Each structure stands twice: as structure tokens, then as C-alpha cells.
């Protein structure tokens, strides 16, 4: 059974007309979760993508990024919602469908020039990933690649990120569905 088949689709959530891709069904399935981590690990081992640190977006990026950090022997840095990190932070505001949000990272989380794998569960508009990349770059890091379980290419995030020069790796996608 493939990764895609383990992801539940919830129609009309969080609002009418949206097909919500719920990865919690994938994460609770021990074989499915192992497939995710094994396939991501294999990609980075086989393709020799050079990076020093894994940065995960709150909240599901923590789950994937933490497991991937363990399997690949890399450190892990969380990007969090405002007010969740003690100490000095940098922040980045980004656009939501109706308004804005903000994410934060410790100012000393990365050494200057660190190459980073940015990890999140799903790529839709690209706003969260762009905010994460901006934080990494603000503290002197470089995005080596971005990894996602799911890509929703029709929403435009993939195109936006690639136009900015970011390399992406996605395990599966839901196109026009």
C-alpha cells in the first residue's frame, strides 16, 4: 500500500470546497510512517544532497524532521509559532488566505553558512515554506532542499518556490483532486 493511499481526504474542511489532505492517518499507521521516513532517508542518502541540519515547521514538520534527523544523523531545529521559544528569536510574517501569521526561530539556531533541509508535511501555497526559508536565511543559513510528504501542485506553492530557486522533494501529490 502506497503512501498516498494512507492519507485521508476530508471534503469541505476547513470550509466548503476544500479537500483537506489529512496525514494523521498516515502517521498513525506504523508501516506508513516507516515508509515516509525510509523513502525520505533513501532519497538523501542516494542523491548525496549536502546539508548540515534539518529544520522542521510546526507542527507536523517536527514529527517528520525529528525522525529524519535521527535516521540521517543530523541535528534538528524547530520553527515555531510566536511565543513558544525561550530566548532571543527572529520572526517572519507570512500571508494566509485571510490575513497573516508569523513563525519564529532561535537567532543562534544555525551556524553561518549551514546548509539546511527544510521539512514540512504538506506544500500548498508555499507561504509557510517561504517563511521558514526566510528565517533560515536571516540567521545565515542556506536552504539545500525542501522536503514534503504531500504536494498540492494546483495551488501553486511548488511553482512559487521553484521560481525562487529552491529545490524540492515531495513523496506524493494530489493533482486536480
Curated annotation (Swiss-Prot):
Q: Where in the cell is it found?
A: Cytoplasm
User: Which Gene3D superfamilies does the annotation name?
Assistant: 3.40.50.2020
**Gene Ontology MF terms:** adenine binding; adenine phosphoribosyltransferase activity; AMP binding
For this UniProt record, the keywords arranged alphabetically read as follows: Cytoplasm, Glycosyltransferase, Purine salvage, Transferase
Q: Which SUPFAM superfamilies match?
A: PRTase-like (SSF53271)
> Which Pfam families does the record cross-reference, listed alphabetically?
Pribosyltran
- GO biological processes: adenine salvage; AMP salvage; purine ribonucleoside salvage
Catalysed reaction equations from the record: AMP + diphosphate = 5-phospho-alpha-D-ribose 1-diphosphate + adenine
Please indicate if the UniProt record lists Amino-acid biosynthesis as a keyword. no
Enzyme class, top EC level, equals transferase
Indicate whether Cytoplasm appears among the record's keywords. yes
Its main localization is cytoplasm
Database matches in InterPro entries: Ade_phspho_trans, PRibTrfase_dom, PRTase-like, UPRTase/APRTase
Q: In which pathway does it act?
A: Purine metabolism; AMP biosynthesis via salvage pathway; AMP from adenine: step 1/1
Q: What is its EC number?
A: 2.4.2.7
This entry carries the following GO cellular component terms, namely: cytoplasm
Protein family membership: Belongs to the purine/pyrimidine phosphoribosyltransferase family.
Q: What does this protein do?
A: Catalyzes a salvage reaction resulting in the formation of AMP, that is energically less costly than de novo synthesis.
According to the record's subunit comment, the protein's assembly and interactions are: Homodimer.
Q: What is this protein called?
A: Adenine phosphoribosyltransferase
- Lineage, opening ranks: Bacteria, Pseudomonadati, Chlorobiota, Chlorobiia, Chlorobiales
